[in-house]
Amino acid sequence: MSPIFINITLAFTISLLGMLVYRSHLMASLLCLEGMMMSLFITIALMASNTHSPLINIMPITLLVFAACETAVGLALLVSISNTYGLDYIHNLNLLQC
């Protein structure tokens, strides 16, 4: 296994651990999720460049589109929760009430 893949795997693991540790703060969770998406993007882009298959070349772009949609929805939720409750600490929020 090359050092690049080891570093990308380490970045994904650190982002995953950060997601587990900071799951009660929405902003920190979104940042960790973006770190996971970027490490997945780099991994898929490297695999696409190594295989030279025309079908796999669209996968990194598709992942970036999904990451952008996830970011937009996450930031919209963050703004909505921050405007309503004044904080991003989602552990104390009861989001099921009307």
From Swiss-Prot:
Family label: Belongs to the complex I subunit 4L family.
Summary of subunit composition and partner proteins: Core subunit of respiratory chain NADH dehydrogenase (Complex I) which is composed of 45 different subunits.
Catalytic activities: a ubiquinone + NADH + 5 H(+)(in) = a ubiquinol + NAD(+) + 4 H(+)(out)
Transmembrane annotation, as ranges: 1-21, 26-46, 61-81
Compartments, as annotated in UniProt: Mitochondrion inner membrane
A GO BP annotation: ATP synthesis coupled electron transport
Name of the protein in its database record: NADH-ubiquinone oxidoreductase chain 4L
GO molecular function, one term: NADH dehydrogenase (ubiquinone) activity
Membrane topology field: Multi-pass membrane protein
GO cellular component terms, A-Z: mitochondrial inner membrane; respiratory chain complex I
Function: Core subunit of the mitochondrial membrane respiratory chain NADH dehydrogenase (Complex I) which catalyzes electron transfer from NADH through the respiratory chain, using ubiquinone as an electron acceptor. Part of the enzyme membrane arm which is embedded in the lipid bilayer and involved in proton translocation.
Superkingdom of this protein's organism: Eukaryota
PANTHER family: NADH-UBIQUINONE OXIDOREDUCTASE CHAIN 4L, NADH-UBIQUINONE OXIDOREDUCTASE SUBUNIT ND4L
Lineage of the species this protein comes from: Eukaryota, Metazoa, Chordata, Craniata, Vertebrata
Chain's gene name: MT-ND4L
Gene3D superfamilies: 1.10.287.3510
EC number(s) per entry: 7.1.1.2
Keywords of this entry: Electron transport, Membrane, Mitochondrion, Mitochondrion inner membrane, NAD, Respiratory chain, Translocase, Transmembrane, Transmembrane helix, Transport, Ubiquinone
